[in-house]
Amino acid sequence: MKYELTATEARVIGCLLEKQVTTPEQYPLSVNGVVTACNQKTNREPVMNLTEQEVQEQLDNLVKRHFLRTVSGFGNRVTKYEQRFCNSEFGDLKLSAAEVALVTTLLLRGAQTPGELRSRASRMHEFSDMAEVESTLERLASREDGPYVVRLAREPGKRESRYIHLFCGDVDELSLQTSAPESASGDLQSRVEALESEVAELKQRLDSLLAHLGE
């Protein structure tokens, strides 16, 4: 694969993919918008605290690698960014809506079980059942131009295996197992996190609307 992203680059691309679907009225994003999205406390693992300068450096690098492009509207002096990571006119990576939702959630949160992915990706794509989630993951894992995800060995005491994306290169399963957070009620936690993320999105929309009305 030609995708060798750093953790920060993966966060930036994941945020742009997420906002393109969940808040299309605010997309493309300005530098400040990307900073806010990257440092968001909901639906992010780990939580980051990136500066504007750090984000700008990542954006510049990703533009050079043709994973993003800048957009300047008529009369708009603020440079905005949109993703060309997948489904762009001249790009090679083509993903379905279900695949975009899962890839985005994996980019933003790292290794997760199919159950966690179904809950956390629900704002981007409504999966009909667990079978759809699992079949989508298997397609991503077996694509000829991939693989883009891999299933990790099931951890002791866990009911489900976790999946992780491969856009940052190969994974070290041992380090992932030792650093995996404990979760006694993963499904409930996922639902709470999804609700918190939805509230955060609604707050962003309200703030944007109030700012627009105040102009």
Curated annotation (Swiss-Prot):
InterPro entries: DUF480, WH-like_DNA-bd_sf, WH_DNA-bd_sf. It holds the Pfam family DUF480. Transmembrane segments: none annotated. It comes from the Bacteria. Belongs to the UPF0502 family. PANTHER family: UPF0502 PROTEIN YCEH (PTHR38768:SF1). This is UPF0502 protein YceH. It comes from Salmonella paratyphi A (strain AKU_12601). The lineage of its organism: Bacteria, Pseudomonadati, Pseudomonadota, Gammaproteobacteria, Enterobacterales. The gene is yceH.
